[in-house]
Regions:
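Loop-helix junctions at membrane interfaces
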Residues: 1-256
Length: 256
């Protein structure tokens, strides 16, 4: 693919991702930070079809545009945190799926790239907004680490199902390298990640140490709604984990 085509594809990716991200930008995590963003499907497709550079750069530009549109001016946390994380995540996805594209590779690559990308965004974002004075000064380094970890989990759990369920049929519709080689392993794709989230749900619900640490962070961030926020987080992990596990097992049995 020539330079002109790469530039055009990158611009299209950025524009579509910006529009898709802006449409859900007001749906945020229970912490009041971090957006619900199913639009990650778009740069994922561009990374696989046009290469890691196109998807990564398009995602970085698109997220800055979307966040800046929401806030009415250039949004520094997006430029300094979301852009690098988006670029790294989708660049890795494109790199890992460049050759011998198959279901197993796509599933594993999606999980690896999203975990790395989500963690990069979350921890950088936490550091940046703390330095900019956008968080309560009472937050300790441990609180900031917990917030970064919680946002990482939020990003992944609200983005991964869309990638794993929507990207393959879209690639088929685009006739990208023919059909995906091999059948989908829904155990690897959905059931195992779902079981992990169920485990996290049990930990933050029934383990006193974990629940108290999380409760302490929530009280500092939003004291008026601390209990309801904690319950919402527990429900999010339990519901998402159960749904992913059950759907993964059913699809695996059906395809067997």
């Amino acid at each position: 693919m020539g330079m002109g085509e790469r530039v055009s594809a990158t611009g299209l990716c950025a524009a579509l991702y910006a529009i898709g991200s802006f449409l859900t930008s007001y749906l945020v995590s229970p912490f009041g930070r971090g957006q619900f963003r199913p639009a990650v499907v778009l740069p994922a497709i561009f990374s696989i079809v046009y290469g890691p550079g196109v998807g990564g750069l398009g995602a970085a530009i698109g997220t800055v545009i979307a966040d800046s549109m929401k806030h009415g001016s250039l949004y520094l946390p997006s430029l300094l945190a979301a852009a690098p994380g988006n670029f790294i995540g989708f660049y890795i996805l494109g790199k890992l799926t460049r050759r011998d594209f198959n279901w197993r590779k796509f599933s594993i690559a999606s999980q690896i790239s999203l975990w790395i990308g989500c963690a990069t965004v979350a921890y950088l974002y936490t550091i940046v907004i703390s330095l900019l004075g956008m968080l309560p000064p009472s937050l300790t380094p441990e609180d900031l680490f917990m917030l970064g970890t919680s946002l990482t989990l939020w990003f992944f759990i609200t983005e991964y199902p869309f990638v794993i369920l929507l990207v393959p049929p879209i690639l088929r519709a685009l006739k990208f390298r023919g059909e995906l080689k091999g059948g989908p392993s829904w155990l690897i794709s959905l059931a195992i990640p779902g079981a992990i989230f169920l485990t996290i749900s049990l930990m933050i619900t029934f383990t006193p140490a974990s629940s108290e640490i999380l409760r302490g962070l929530i009280v500092k961030l939003n004291p008026s709604y601390a209990l309801s926020t904690l319950q919402l987080i527990q429900l999010l992990f339990a519901g998402s984990g159960a749904a992913m596990t059950i759907v993964g097992l059913l699809l695996q049995v059906r395809g067997a």
